[in-house]
């Protein structure tokens, strides 16, 4: 049984059985490659989605940690929590500077007492 194939100039030519098998084989190979590429793409999309979910979980964990650390943080939304965190950090830095100044002052007093036999 002979098959025909349309050519670009719209004429028909006969295909031998071996040529027909080659065309079918190529089509099957194309279909396998297409399925494999689609499968790889789906796997990549799945991996991207999983990575995004993991990142989102990490962010949620960090926000929860901030809510535990910042006084009153549990009652705040994310935006207010970040603002409160910034203020809290500035407050802590100010306290550290104050403690350093007081420590330095007290050390000088102790040194002066030692000079005068105190």
From Swiss-Prot:
Residue ranges constituting the bHLH domain according to the UniProt record: 43-92
GO MF annotations in UniProt: protein homodimerization activity; transcription coregulator activity
GO cellular component: nucleus
Keyword Transcription regulation belongs to the record: yes
Record-given protein name: Transcription factor PAR1
Further facts: Plants overexpressing PAR1 are dwarf with compact rosettes and inflorescences, epinastic leaves, shorter flowering stems and siliques and a general dark-green phenotype. Plants silencing PAR1 exhibit a slight increase in the length of hypocotyls, cotyledons and primary leaves.
Sequence similarity: Belongs to the bHLH protein family.
Keywords for this protein: Brassinosteroid signaling pathway, Growth regulation, Nucleus, Repressor, Transcription, Transcription regulation
Regions annotated as coiled coil: none
Flavoprotein as UniProt keyword: no
Reported function: Atypical bHLH transcription factor that acts as a negative regulator of a variety of shade avoidance syndrome (SAS) responses, including seedling elongation and photosynthetic pigment accumulation. Acts as a direct transcriptional repressor of two auxin-responsive genes, SAUR15 and SAUR68. May function in integrating shade and hormone transcriptional networks in response to light and auxin changes.
Quaternary structure and interacting proteins, as annotated: Homodimer.
Compositionally biased spans, kind Polar residues: 13-23
Example of a GO biological process term: shade avoidance
Top-level taxon: Eukaryota
Region (Disordered): 1-58
Main location: nucleus
Subcellular location(s) of the protein: Nucleus
């Amino acid at each position: 049984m002979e098959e025909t194939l349309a050519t670009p100039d719209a004429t028909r030519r006969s295909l031998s059985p071996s040529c027909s098998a080659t065309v079918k084989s190529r089509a099957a190979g194309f279909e396998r490659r297409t399925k494999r590429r689609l499968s790889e793409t789906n796997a990549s999309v799945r991996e991207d989605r999983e990575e995004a979910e993991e990142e989102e979980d990490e962010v949620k964990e960090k926000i929860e940690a901030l809510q535990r650390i910042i006084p009153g943080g549990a009652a705040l939304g994310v935006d207010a929590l970040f603002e409160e965190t910034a203020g809290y950090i500035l407050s802590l830095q100010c306290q550290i500077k104050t403690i350093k100044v007081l420590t330095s002052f007290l050390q000088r007093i102790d040194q002066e007492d030692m000079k005068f036999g105190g």
